[in-house]
Every structure is written in C-alpha cells, then in structure tokens.
C-alpha cells in the first residue's frame, strides 16, 4: 500500500478528502421527505419494465436487480463519492453504498417488496485508487420474499465486516445521508454547512452517538472547543465505547494541558482497542509500511486471533511472513486463508500456494 489513513472519527462511509465530492457553498438542504422520493419518470419505468404483467415476488426481485444495472434500465454505476438523493442518483446514474441502498428501498417499495435497511457498525475498507485503508460503518438492504431473506449489497466485496448487520430504521438511513453530506462540507472547511447538516441528522436520530462525535469534530475545527467537548461527552453518554469521542477528548485534554484527563481517556481507548481486530490490523499495516516486519507480524497475528474467520487477515500475515523470509509460515497462513474461502477467491489462493510450494 502506498498510503494509510484511519479516520479520527468514524463517519458513515467516511471518505478521504481527496475522494469527496466538493459541495457548492450555500447549497440548499434537501428536506428529509425528499431524499427517497421517486421522480415520476422513474416510477413509470418501474411499472413499464418490472410490474407490467403482474409478476410474482421472486420475479419482481429478479427484475428489479436487473433493472438497476442493465443499460436498458438504470445502468447504475458504483461511485464512492456519489452521496446523492434518489432523484439525483436517477439523473446521474451513480451511487455509493448509502445512495444505492436508498434507491433500492424506494424502488422495492414501489414494486411491492418487503425491504429493510441494515447497518454493519464497523467495517474495514480499502480504496484501491490510492491505497487508503479506512474505517467506517456500512449499510445494505435485506428483502423478504416467500419466507426467505436476500441481502442486496453493492459493495460487499470491498469491505471487511467486524459484526453482523442489524436492521435499522429508514429514518436512520436518511440521517446517515445528511451525516455524509456534513463530512463533505467539513472536508471543504465549510463548518457552518457541516453543522447545519448534522443538525438535520440529529433531529432525525438524536440517539446516534456518531453524529454527536462528528458534530464535536466540526465545532472543534471551527474554533469552538467548549462546544466540541460538550458534543464528545454527549456521544460518550450515549455510547461509552465510542472510540472517536475518546480519541478526540484525549486530544483536547492534551491541548489544554490536562495531563491526568488525557491519560484517563487514552487508557479507556486502549482497553477497547486491545480487543479490536481492526485496530490490530491497522497497526500491522502501519508497521509493515514502515519496514518493521517483527511488529507487523505480531499485530497481524493479533488480528487473526481476534477475528480468525477473516481470510484477508491470514493472507496479510502470510505476506508479512514472506517478506521476513519465513516461507513455511507464509504457506501455513495462506493455506488457512484458502480454507476460509470458496469460488474464485479460493482458486486465487490455490495458485499462490502452488507458486510458494514450488520454490
């Protein structure tokens, strides 16, 4: 990897600033009830291309999936920075994970399908364009058809989930949209615009700790340290294990010279991070990039111990072993990665194993 970024606050689908769409100053905020509104031409397409012959639920779901990606339908393309409303996505034919989920849910409702948004609280993602590793939340949708549930996820192969997805309300999903826009405005140093958007997110879902933590970041960067501290503390009241709030409160304490408070926050943060496989993996990547292979191997092994079913952790450990000249250990770790996979991924691991064993 060429570079590494770990967000200091885990906004949903947090993007590296260079990858974010640049918001227009003074741009009007779309009302919450407009975020998932279907444009009339799109509604007509749903009825003419999906519902025209009154298909059954399974057929409707299959047609909807094809409609979203086929050139004769919407021809949607995944674009990481495309944080858009349903109407904007229809016009641009692009969507990120959040917008794709908003769009799918709106279309599923029009098609008479029972669909629900889901959230994975923490994921580890990798942006191939610039080698950036990032932490965030992730959303997708689940559909119930004939007693079975199907997951609809446009970027499932781009992430490493820590936890299983849990259902969330559509209100929270829409609040995430405003949170994402706030991050774009923050990256453009538009603090007033970011706070206005976070106000909407908080009005929709005041119990979501990450929004308060993000508001604390915006206030602190705008020079309002007292307001930022208040928001961070509120985030911790909602979620005592909110690592973003703890990290930023430790930073505030350090800047104000309160050493004892800084130590307290850093100890709390360290306790959480000791059982966090993503933190171990990030530390390992940092060490590997710095050329510290012994530490990288230790941290990769810790990540593997904490989340042993993640094949990419075993693969990364194998690569570190290989760089350290420990071929036998690399083969063992790669074999474990292979055993945890199937299909094309398993075949790719098999090729790598054959090449190593032939040395």
Question: What spans do the regions from the language model cover?
Answer:
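Canonical positions in the second alpha-helix
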Residues: 200-201, 234-235, 268-269, 302-303, ...
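Short coil turns that delineate tetratricopeptide repeat
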Residues: 206, 240, 274-275, 308, ...
């Amino acid at each position: 990897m060429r570079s590494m970024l770990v967000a200091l606050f885990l906004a949903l689908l947090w993007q590296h600033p260079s990858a974010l769409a640049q918001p227009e100053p003074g741009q009007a905020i779309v009302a919450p009830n407009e975020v998932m509104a279907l444009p009339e031409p799109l509604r007509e397409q749903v009825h003419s291309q999906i519902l025209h012959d009154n298909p059954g639920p399974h057929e409707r779901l299959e047609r909807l999936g094809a409609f979203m990606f086929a050139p004769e339908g919407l021809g949607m393309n995944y674009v990481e920075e495309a944080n858009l409303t349903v109407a904007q996505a229809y016009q641009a034919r692009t969507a990120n994970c959040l917008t794709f989920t908003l769009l799918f849910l709106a279309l599923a409702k029009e098609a008479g399908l029972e669909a629900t948004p889901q959230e994975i609280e923490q994921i580890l993602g990798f942006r191939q364009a610039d080698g950036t590793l990032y932490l965030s939340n992730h959303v997708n949708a689940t559909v119930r058809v004939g007693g079975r549930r199907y997951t609809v996820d446009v970027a499932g192969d781009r992430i490493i989930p820590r936890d299983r997805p849990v259902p969330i309300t559509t209100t929270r999903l829409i609040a995430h949209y405003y949170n994402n826009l706030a991050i774009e405005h923050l990256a453009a140093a538009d603090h007033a615009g970011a706070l206005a958007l976070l106000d909407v997110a908080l009005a929709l879902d005041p119990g979501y700790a990450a929004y308060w933590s993000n508001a604390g970041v915006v206030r602190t960067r705008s020079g309002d340290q007292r307001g930022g501290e208040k928001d961070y503390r509120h985030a911790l009241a909602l979620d005592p294990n909110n690592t973003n709030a703890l990290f930023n409160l430790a930073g505030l304490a350090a800047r104000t010279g309160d050493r004892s408070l800084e130590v307290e926050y850093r100890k709390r943060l360290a306790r959480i991070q000791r059982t966090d496989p993503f933190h171990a993996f990030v530390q390992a990547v940092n060490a590997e990039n710095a050329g510290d292979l012994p530490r990288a191997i230790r941290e990769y092994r810790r990540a593997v111990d904490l989340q042993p079913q993640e094949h990419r952790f075993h693969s990364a450990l194998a690569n570190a072993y290989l760089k350290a000249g420990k071929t036998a250990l690399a083969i063992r770790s790669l074999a474990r990665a292979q055993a945890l996979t199937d299909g094309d991924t398993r075949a790719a691991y098999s090729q790598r194993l054959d090449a190593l064993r032939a040395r």
